[in-house]
């Protein structure tokens, strides 16, 4: 088509003569083909310089130049003009400083639009939501609020006695009336707070931290027994457990904004919590409801559409089993450490008696000092047993209960899904009933059937939204729970290792101090 176009233009008009060329040199340039080439090149100069050329002519002219490039290359003018389009395409992706600005402005944006944005868009859409969620969770976790539980005090006598704890709060949040305040709370108040929060938030998929478990034996000893070491140990364990429970409550952004939590922390007197006793009617009803829920959960077979929930539930169940095994081992370790402390104390007493009856002065003094060292070691073992319990055993016990609440959140999501499926099945039955009424030609009942269909369609839509909402909440709550769990375990393990290191350093210090006395025995 290039050669044909050149012949047509040569027949209609003659190209202007090139200055400085003689007829002999033109004839030696190659006959008719150079003339066609000359006419094409001259026509190109005319069209590129014209201001009325449309945008659709530029790519056509460019394609017409490509076949000419394979033609005669003996003319120097052809070589320059044939190389110029190649320079345009080669430089278009690198720089924009060329003479033909119109062609560059059309070609360069097309290549940048294809190459750059599609590479950045998927990454931003894929990773940005997770980053925002994590950043939001970090901001939510930074609360300037600290609660402390101190001064357990026995009030009353006999079986009507109870223990009141001083709950102190320090905060700069504008939610509260002052920066520091304190109230008195009994154990049933903590249980009542959990019941209120669980009733409001658990059905929406939130993980409400559970309170410490009841202990009938321990509390009975406190009520009717005298103030001995076992009662003091029980009260200290419960005080620490209540403090951890309340701190987890106020660390949760949703729970902190609940009016019941603020009332619990600020109000001087609370109404008596009902239904918190184990053997009460409400307590027995709760046990029955839990058993019913367990049976119904076994009958529900959910077709999980999101593999994340299925995998995460399996992880939670496996982790709960492993934590139970580890907790049993740590409790055994605590008991062994306490036995070691008792045996060390008996060993110290025996050494002291032996040293007092020894005639050799140096040996008697060495045995007496060894008995003192063993007494110090007995204190170290006792302290380490307490550290084993409060830093490891109690941490594992808390997270065993927390994992049970996490499983309950998954179960609540399953119940919401089952309610949605039941509504869909009911809607299908209503539609089938409407079809039967239409077939039987009963217009008097048809309007009622249509109203019921509209009602159940609205329910299906609402239950579907509820399922989507609780799925979002459970996912976010599990992510937050895992983050808090990692922080808790890190802090407790570091503290536990520091106590072990301190214990070993003290042991080395005691033995190094005693070694010269042992060497001085003659």
UniProtKB/Swiss-Prot annotation:
Name of the protein in its database record: Sorting nexin-1
Residue numbers of N6-acetyllysine PTMs: 237
Subcellular locations according to the entry: Endosome membrane; Golgi apparatus, trans-Golgi network membrane; Early endosome membrane; Cell projection, Lamellipodium
Biased composition (Polar residues): 60-73
PX domain sequence ranges: 143-272
UniProt-annotated stretches for the region Disordered: 1-89, 115-142
Organism: Macaca fascicularis (Crab-eating macaque)
Function, in words: Involved in several stages of intracellular trafficking. Interacts with membranes containing phosphatidylinositol 3-phosphate (PtdIns(3P)) or phosphatidylinositol 3,5-bisphosphate (PtdIns(3,5)P2). Acts in part as component of the retromer membrane-deforming SNX-BAR subcomplex. The SNX-BAR retromer mediates retrograde transport of cargo proteins from endosomes to the trans-Golgi network (TGN) and is involved in endosome-to-plasma membrane transport for cargo protein recycling.
Annotated stretches, region: Membrane-binding amphipathic helix: 281-298
GO cellular component: cytosol; early endosome membrane; endosome membrane; Golgi apparatus; lamellipodium
Pfam family for this entry, one: PX
